[in-house]
């Protein structure tokens, strides 16, 4: 959040991510520019709730969280309690919990910080599994007859699909979905569930994404959301790893660790800078009503 930090010491983020089995998780640190428990700057600000990918951590998204906070937003990055990605039997947990976590966090923060957050202006940003969660909360209807919904033990995903009101976020004005999960043959929203989304959308993806797909991922979702004012930013030849920080030094020893963070074609700092540019313009227009920001979104050429 915007703060009066002065010369106080800046934070260092510490986390760990899954290593290639059977190795233990790899711990790493990321230097930040935020100040822990700093006094908030006066005023009420739009809320941005950020949801990381399956097996990711919030520290790996500081390139975006701190950047947005410095531009006048209250940014809350959820630390999801994901199971080990190697345990495929527990994969269904995030499918159920991502939308619930996002809706719960947004509602709780508005109640806890009424003097800091403007409850009428909220945006969701999600990477990979977080993108699925954000789109679902925004109105994408899970198909109760779909393969994934029927395959979740106990029918919990079917129950979630039949109670969309439980996921609604008041004051929702925009969603940014980076490499969003949900398509690529899984079709969690069925043939027309995405048509329920009407808030402005910004999809960001690499067209060589082998994890969640592109034609049946972000590009397909873009085509399936006709009610929304929407944009699609594509990194040509990029894969799935376009949503995190540059790889910390501790995550460069093995290809598995490095692959969490880095793309095979694009420099990560270049990716982050481009994403910051478009996300900044998109949120300024949708959350602050700054019409002049459209000039940064409506680019003069499709391929550049």
Question: Predicted regions span which residues?
Answer:
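Active-site-adjacent alpha-helix of alpha/beta-hydrolase-fold enzymes
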Residues: 192-272
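Short, solvent-exposed beta-strand-terminating loops
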Residues: 1-17, 132-145, 231-252
